[in-house]
């Protein structure tokens, strides 16, 4: 409607374009894979702040982060298409947005890397499948309440970074925020398979 268009034109567009610019700025091109990657981040799950025994913070290619980046970039490009020509030109001038940068957004939004386990499970981040399975039953038996698992492990001189254990929904957040159709479109755009069973399979795993 008219009010939405007005908001988009004068406030929303500038915000989403700047957010897209941020995602573009933290994407790194990997020439060996011809894919873009987002390195050294923490996804929604606070149990994984770094790789086991690494002194560098963050993990690489968190699926939630990478998909959200692709979504923002595609929405930003759509917004520019929606704006009246004069407003679009004005915004591009104010933000110093040129065709080359928009071309980069387009490229990143089609070549962002996602990582999968061998069986097609979406990896929470690169290397998640190499982590150790956590002994949930053993720890419940030993401690009863293991809600603060991070504190329990740290008291034992251990860290949740080593285990397949999550404090917050991470990959699963994607299925909450996007419909299966939206996710299929994003995966298709990236050239990755998204089957009918992808969602139940991942929900079951995580």
Label each residue range with its predicted role.
Residues 1-10, 22-106:
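The feature captures the catalytic groove of carbohydrate-active enzymes
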Residues 16:
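Conserved functional hotspot residues or short segments at active or partner-binding sites
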Residues 13:
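Short conserved active-site loop signatures built around small residues
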Residues 10, 66-67, 74, 78-81, ...:
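Active-site core of glycosidic bond-cleaving carbohydrate-active enzymes
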Residues 1-5, 20-24, 171-181:
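Alpha-helical support elements that line or immediately flank enzyme active sites
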């Amino acid at each position: 409607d008219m009010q939405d268009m007005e908001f988009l034109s004068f406030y929303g567009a500038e915000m989403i374009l700047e957010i897209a610019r941020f995602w573009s700025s933290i994407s790194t091109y990997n020439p060996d894979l011809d894919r873009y990657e987002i390195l050294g981040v923490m996804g929604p799950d606070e149990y994984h702040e770094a790789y086991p025994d690494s002194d560098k913070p963050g993990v690489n290619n968190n699926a939630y982060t990478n998909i959200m980046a692709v979504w923002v970039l595609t929405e930003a490009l759509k917004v520019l298409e929606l704006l009246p020509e004069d407003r679009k030109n004005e915004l591009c001038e104010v933000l110093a947005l040129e065709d080359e940068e928009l071309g980069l957004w387009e490229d990143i939004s089609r070549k962002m890397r996602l990582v999968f386990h061998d069986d097609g499970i979406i990896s929470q981040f690169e290397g998640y499948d190499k982590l150790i399975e956590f002994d949930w039953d053993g720890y419940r038996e030993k401690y009863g309440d293991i809600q603060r698992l991070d504190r329990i492990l740290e008291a034992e001189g251990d860290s949740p970074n080593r285990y397949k254990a999550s404090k917050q929904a991470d990959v699963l957040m994607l299925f909450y925020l996007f419909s299966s159709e939206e996710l299929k479109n994003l995966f298709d755009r990236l050239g990755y398979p998204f089957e009918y069973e992808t969602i139940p399979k991942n929900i079951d795993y995580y």
